[in-house]
């Protein structure tokens, strides 16, 4: 039952993100309700619960497909892209979480302001999407894993926008410059919601980022390569197979 519940949490998270972009799966939605009901049904046998667990996995894949369809239909298929992981001088906003639509809205509203936008954590893959990396002020990625955010956000001379997922208790050193949006939030943290048209006004975080000013000097450029989604990777399939056969490629590492 716990495994099913964990699976449903993932299904709801990815399903919500897809729905924010206008995509959803009736099959996954119907299963979600049935599975929630089954979690409280003590009449189910172990065999029935195992079958339900396997079905949960199938629906997780289904909703991931739907989210991938949404992301690629709107922002195009990811392609390899170099990303600077150090900060430039000037005002900046760091965007963390999962919601590509929030990132896009912020990029549009900060055009021409001189503000650099940096991804953080699981936003890093956004740099591979042509529909997002077309914005020149999407300047790079900041920091590492989400669990290090309290240390990495400490005393930053810029603002942070937390979209869905991975917000930890903010320290006092940056609580006045961190904002939340979508389904994430924290007591005392400024929240940016939708208007009646489904749009968001990011003027408050933009104004504060300009006031803070950012760093006075550029940091040395250090780049990493992202954008190898399944579509891009399959484009190199023949070269990968040849490298394996020749012994040039001997190890594959699964992360996540």
Locate the predicted segments by residue.
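Metallocofactor- and cofactor-centric catalytic cores in central/energy metabolism, strongly enriched
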Residues: 1-256
